[in-house]
């Protein structure tokens, strides 16, 4: 498997340090608000990474933290009358609810900052003792950026260039404008902990250094997060951890691209964000997950409702094919006629191409394309009156089910019972278009009675009324079925 390593700026073969095992640390949310689509994208991207590593046979330990003390949490507490702890608990629970709905596996370990204050203080003390950090008269602790010779290696920034634009805010006691806070002295009304430098709380960057080292051996195999974390957060993590331990912090640095709206990054600060819950009022969670996987995880993805509709259409087609396959396999009589050799070889080639796409830096966009190739092939078999009767066709359909189950387990897709999922999607699309499903069912019953009575004029009139509502009717041996046109 090849992974793009932000540190080396190239794809590299992924070789875990401990045979048969892999460690993955991903920076989690700051728990002060509901998650937006940027959070969904990061969670889905790293969920697929972890699933794929496990698919290859590795024993993966996945750690993702929660930042549960931060300026934003303190501010939200002041706005709502809740304590900082209550704010963090509320939004950590909301995160789990949202990601559970999106089918993201929970991390094996979910450390919280407030549960690791001792480790953070110890790391600060270690850095001070090594001359890499210093405390101030007011009780703040800062990291000496220039004491770490390779500062900037992840982001590709030059220290002297950064220095020219750096400023010291009033009241700060930095030796150098580039230095960043490891420990912040307590302000009135804020949560605090006792420390050798007085009451205070940790800075953001020290948190992940302390928690990752606590729960995983160094160097980490993979450290991940959104592209916005490359600088300063991940750059500062490297400086702290490597200055303190003398060890490499992580071998592979993996970063997902932004979700964009009108070519701008989606973020709370820009005010152009939609929460996951906003989107899931109109679409099924699996549709959103599918949409997020239609682009390579490192590329930006433009969020549009047209894009969501396209994802929904494609996901529906895949499930319709899975439903067809399920029904076709109910047959008990099959002929001895062979399938054309090119059909069997096309299935082999599709499986090879899917594996190749995923091995190439988790190219889910290409992998979904190969799944569509399989869907087209299977529909060709089912629609051909000769091929569909073949016992080899049965074997091909069973193989398709097996392939889709394996691939779906990696992508977190296609795991639902097809007929049930299609009904759910139909009702979701109906709700989005304000179609009264109870009225539809009533009209279908009336149409059924009209057909029994051979009142075809009335039956056709009802079909036309349903069509005006945006509903199409399919008459099947099992009775009338309906869907949104």
Curated annotation (Swiss-Prot):
Q: Does the keyword Lipoprotein apply?
A: no
- The enzyme's main class, written as a single word, is ligase
Q: Where in the cell is it found?
A: Cytoplasm
| Pfam family, any one | tRNA-synt_1e
Q: What Gene Ontology molecular-function terms does this entry list? A: ATP binding; cysteine-tRNA ligase activity; zinc ion binding
Q: Which cofactor does it need?
A: Zn(2+)
Q: How is the cofactor bound?
A: Binds 1 zinc ion per subunit.
Query: Reaction catalysed?
Result: tRNA(Cys) + L-cysteine + ATP = L-cysteinyl-tRNA(Cys) + AMP + diphosphate
What are the GO cellular component annotations? cytosol
Q: Where is this motif: 'KMSKS' region?
A: 265-269
Record EC number: 6.1.1.16
InterPro entries named in the record: Cys-tRNA-ligase, Cys-tRNA-synt_Ia_DALR, Cys-tRNA/MSH_ligase, CysS_C, Rossmann-like_a/b/a_fold, tRNA-synt_1_cat_dom, tRNAsynth_Ia_anticodon-bd
Which parts of the sequence form the motif 'HIGH' region? 29-39
Q: What is its main location?
A: cytoplasm
Q: Look up the record and give one Gene Ontology term from the biological process aspect.
A: cysteinyl-tRNA aminoacylation
**What Gene3D superfamilies does the record tag this protein with?**
Cysteine-tRNA ligase, C-terminal anti-codon recognition domain, HUPs
Where is Zn(2+) bound in this sequence? 27, 208, 233, 237
Keyword annotations for this protein, in alphabetical order, are:
Aminoacyl-tRNA synthetase, ATP-binding, Cytoplasm, Ligase, Metal-binding, Nucleotide-binding, Protein biosynthesis, Zinc
In this chain, ATP is annotated as bound at 268
The family this protein is said to belong to: Belongs to the class-I aminoacyl-tRNA synthetase family.
On subunit structure and binding partners, the annotation says: Monomer.
- Name the chain's protein: Cysteine--tRNA ligase
Q: Which organism is it from?
A: Oleidesulfovibrio alaskensis (strain ATCC BAA-1058 / DSM 17464 / G20) (Desulfovibrio alaskensis)
Organismal lineage: Bacteria, Pseudomonadati, Thermodesulfobacteriota, Desulfovibrionia, Desulfovibrionales
